[in-house]
Amino acid sequence: MYCPFCHAEETKVVDSRLVADGAQVRRRRECLECHERFTTFETAELIMPLIIKRDGRREPFHIDNLRSGMLRALEKRPVSVDDLEKAIISITEEIRRRGEREIDSQMVGELVMKELFRLDHVAYVRFASVYKRFKDVSDFRQTIDQMKNEDKEKS
């Protein structure tokens, strides 16, 4: 690593510690030329798969797109930011766990629906209406009836 002070190539690690719940490593380094000390942070770069859209286009996975879609469905609903973030982490971990280079947007949508169903039924119906392209009120009724049946089965 280059020294940010004198730009020498040789530095040594003086101290290393885990931070951010083990997701990052904080390192204190010392330049072997000018002896200045500085701190670096290292995080693992996890490559997410490409998303295959309905029209066949391929786009990189963007967690912000996932978050904004879920936030839109959860607007004015009593769901905490922590619960939303846990759901987003669950979805991204599932996508990563599959280990595929490309993944259909439909699969991502199904994972979102599963999490929204768990978090808030109104948000689930909102998201489903866009995701499944509801045409009329009967589509809403059908989805609500399915939800009622799933709730009865769980009881």
UniProtKB/Swiss-Prot annotation:
Top-rank taxon: Bacteria
Zinc-finger ranges (unnamed): 3-34
CC cofactor: Zn(2+)
GO terms classed as biological process: negative regulation of DNA-templated transcription
Signal peptide interval: none
Keywords annotated in UniProt: ATP-binding, DNA-binding, Metal-binding, Nucleotide-binding, Repressor, Transcription, Transcription regulation, Zinc, Zinc-finger
Keyword Transmembrane: no
PROSITE patterns named among the record's database cross-references: ATP_CONE (PS51161)
Domain annotation ATP-cone: ranges: 49-139
Molecular function terms from GO: ATP binding; DNA binding; zinc ion binding
Cofactor mode of binding and number, as noted: Binds 1 zinc ion.
UniProt similarity note: Belongs to the NrdR family.
Function description: Negatively regulates transcription of bacterial ribonucleotide reductase nrd genes and operons by binding to NrdR-boxes.
NCBIfam families documented for this protein: transcriptional regulator NrdR
Protein name as annotated: Transcriptional repressor NrdR
Protein source organism: Legionella pneumophila (strain Lens)
